[in-house]
Amino acid sequence: MICTSNHNDWKSDMYRTYSISGNRGKDANYKGECYPALAPKLSFWKVWHNNIGKISEEENNKYYVQEYWNQVLSKLDPEKVYRELDYSVLLCYEPNTVFCHRHIVAAWLEILLGVKVPEVRLEDYRIIETSRPEYIKEILEEIMKANINMRGFTSLRALYLFEKGEELEAKADKLEEETGKCYDGYRQSACYLRCEADMVEEEYRKNKQQHVLNRKKK
């Protein structure tokens, strides 16, 4: 599992940590490992920072999420990132309830991989799960859907699984053409991925419908 936290809430060397800030945790005197691939680009960070107080917080944060998706996350393989960072805590500066790109990273992994990436703090050697701004995940999902071909899906995770299946199918085609051998294992895995995509899509639609009903009751 990957968790996220801030330097004030996680002061321990008991667990593997990675700074994902642009200055590698310098402001917190952090001496541990870093994962610069997830750091925000200075160009859009400056625009966002300079706009604080000049435009609405909602508009400004949406700009940040949009650029972070365009310039950082869309270039990365979520499965590779998860493998490399598994069993670690990703660190940045802001308190858990404040807008921060670590919350965008958590939302991205949860949306595409169907995993849980909790925000945590360390208290008397106990890991305590805390809250984070939920609107960040909603904004990211909206932006991702607006920037890719959903191919009839409503769930980004379902689309991700379907396209992974297509990649395996294409790989089998290429290898069979090159070697003359059968790669039924790849084709079977591709079939499983497409079936999983259909199940994820169905569950996503049900949850959306239930969410709408719950809001109407309120």
Residue ranges of each PLM-predicted region?
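A compositionally biased, intrinsically disordered/low-complexity signal enriched
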Residues: 164, 174-175, 200
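The feature captures the hydrophobic core positions of alpha-helical coiled-coils
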Residues: 168, 172-175, 190-193
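Residues lining hydrophobic/aromatic ligand-binding pockets adjacent to catalytic sites
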Residues: 1-135
